[in-house]
A protein has these predicted regions:
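Interfacial loop-to-transmembrane junctions
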Residues: 112-138
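Functional transmembrane core segments of multi-pass inner-membrane proteins
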Residues: 10-110
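Juxtamembrane boundary at the C-terminal end of a transmembrane helix
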Residues: 140-144
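N-terminal signal-anchor transmembrane helix
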Residues: 4-7
Length: 144
C-alpha cells in the first residue's frame, strides 16, 4: 500500500514535467520502480515475483517501441512503465497489461481529439507519461 502512496506523490510532478519538457526524470522514475519492487518483496514474495514478471513483460514491450523507427516511446516511459507494472501487477499480470492498454487508448483518444481540433499535427511529439499514469491508475482502481 505504501508503494501506491509513493505513486500518488510522484504522479503529479511526473505529469507536469512530461507535459512541459517531454521527459520523465530518472530521479522520479527509478525510485518509483525500485521502491515498488522493495515494497512488494517486503509485503509478500509471491506478489513481488508476480509484479516483477509483469514489469519485465511491460518493459520488453516498451523497449521494442523505444527502439523502433520514429521512437514512439522514450526511455523515461520504459522506466515509468516498469515501475507501474510492478504495482498493478501485484493484482495479476493481466492487470498490468490492462494498464498498458488503457494508457494507449486514453492517450489515443486525446490525440485524436487534438488532431480534430487542430491543436497538434501528425508530426508533433506527444508526452505519454500522463496517459501511462492514468491508464495504470484506472487498472489499479479496478483491480484493488
Amino acid at each position: 500500500m505504501w508503494a501506491h502512496v509513493a505513486l500518488a506523490v510522484v504522479a503529479i510532478p511526473l505529469t507536469l514535467v512530461d507535459l512541459r519538457e517531454h521527459r520523465l526524470p530518472d530521479r522520479l522514475t527509478l525510485p518509483l520502480w525500485g521502491g515498488s519492487a522493495v515494497t512488494a518483496l517486503l509485503a509478500d514474495p509471491d506478489i513481488a515475483i508476480q509484479g516483477m514478471v509483469a514489469s519485465a513483460v511491460v518493459v520488453a514491450f516498451f523497449l521494442m517501441a523505444a527502439e523502433s523507427p520514429g521512437q514512439p516511446l522514450g526511455y523515461g516511459d520504459v522506466k515509468l512503465g516498469g515501475g507501474l507494472a510492478i504495482q498493478v501487477g501485484w493484482y495479476g499480470i493481466e492487470w498490468a497489461l490492462w494498464g498498458v492498454a488503457l494508457s494507449i487508448v486514453s492517450g489515443g483518444i486525446w490525440a485524436l481529439g487534438a488532431l480534430i481540433r487542430r491543436k497538434l499535427s501528425l508530426r508533433d511529439d506527444l508526452p505519454f507519461g500522463p496517459w501511462l499514469l492514468m491508464g495504470n491508475l484506472l487498472a489499479l482502481i479496478q483491480a484493488a
